C-alpha cells in the first residue's frame, strides 16, 4: 500500500512539502514537467472536430489605470497531454472528477522500449518486456503508476511523424507504438497498477481498431495518461509522479498537468 498523503501543504520559505508527519525538501529534487503546452500546434486525434482554441477577452490598460488581461478557451477532452477517465471506454467507469487522487499521485516506473519502437513504429509492449524490467528493477507493486517510454515525444508536434498520418478526419492509417493487450492485462489485472501512461497519442497502439487496452483499463477503473513528454528524464523507478487533470464534472477525460519529482 502506498502511504502518500493526498494533501500537500507548502511550507513557506523552507520549500518543504509536508506529507503527514514527513517532510520533503523540494530543493533536493528535480521537478520534471511531463506535459506538452496547449496551443495552436497541439496534436489531437484526426477525427476530432475541433482543436484547442484560445480567445482573447481583454488585454490592455483599463480606465482605472491598471493592466488587465483575460481569455476564454475551448478544447476537446482528448488531445494534448491529457487523461482518459474510465468512462471513456466503460459505461460503468468513473468520470473524471470521480477518479481518486491517490491513483494520480504516487511512485512511478518507466519501461523503456525506445530501441524496439525505433525499429518498429507499431511496437506493442509485451509481457516479456515487463518481466525483463522486473528482473532488472524489481517487481512492479500494487498502486504504481506505469509510464511507457517509446521516445515518440521527440516527434511532437509534427502530426505526420507523431501519428503516422496527417489526413484530417481519417484515423485508419495511424501508426505509433504503445501497450500490447497481454502486457496491459498483466499490469492492470495482476500487478494492480494505479494508472498507465505513455509518450504517444494513445494507450493503444496506432493501428488498433478495437481499443482493447482502453477497455481493459476502463473495466478496472484505471486511468490512462496520454501524450506525455520528458520520460527520458526519469529513472526506471524512484520518481514520484503527480498527474492532476482539470476537475470536469462528468468528463470522459481532460487536460492534464503531470510532473515528476526525481531525487538529485
Where do the protein language model's features map onto the residues?
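Bacterial N-terminal signal peptides
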Residues: 5-16
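Intrinsically disordered, metal-sensing/regulatory segments
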Residues: 3-6, 199
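Active-/binding-site microenvironments in catalytic and ligand-binding cores
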Residues: 17-264
